[in-house]
Curated annotation (Swiss-Prot):
The entry's keywords: Complement alternate pathway, Complement pathway, Disulfide bond, Immunity, Inflammatory response, Innate immunity, Secreted
UniProt keyword annotation of ATP-binding present: no
Gene: C5
GO CC annotation: extracellular region
Cell compartment(s), UniProt: Secreted
Repeat among keywords: no
Superkingdom of the source species: Eukaryota
Main function: Mediator of local inflammatory process released following cleavage by C5 convertase. Acts by binding to its receptor (C5AR1 or C5AR2), activating G protein-coupled receptor signaling and inducing a variety of responses including intracellular calcium release, contraction of smooth muscle, increased vascular permeability, and histamine release from mast cells and basophilic leukocytes. C5a is also a potent chemokine which stimulates the locomotion of polymorphonuclear leukocytes and directs their migration toward sites of inflammation.
Identification of the protein by name: Complement C5a anaphylatoxin
Gene3D superfamilies: Anaphylotoxins (complement system)
């Protein structure tokens, strides 16, 4: 489900290197926020925008998935 959302977002960008920025943003990193990670990008504003967008989508998806109700069979 997350992979599909990220692929849909990456499809909005024409350049392969901008798509890569998006995919890089989707990688999990619990130690830093999306903003902190994006601050290290030196390629350009288009890459930063794609990175932040995909990072936000992935972070939101993971937060929503984390809070799903789980029943254990005992």
């Amino acid at each position: 489900m997350l992979k599909k959302k990220i692929e849909e977002e990456a499809a909005k960008y024409r350049n392969a290197w901008v798509k890569k920025c998006c995919y890089d943003g989707a990688h999990r990193n619990d130690d830093e926020t999306c903003e902190e990670r994006a601050a290290r990008i030196a390629i350009g504003p288009e890459c930063i925008k794609a990175f932040k967008s995909c990072c936000a989508i992935a972070s939101q998806f993971r937060a929503d998935e984390h809070h799903k109700n789980m029943q254990l069979g005992r």
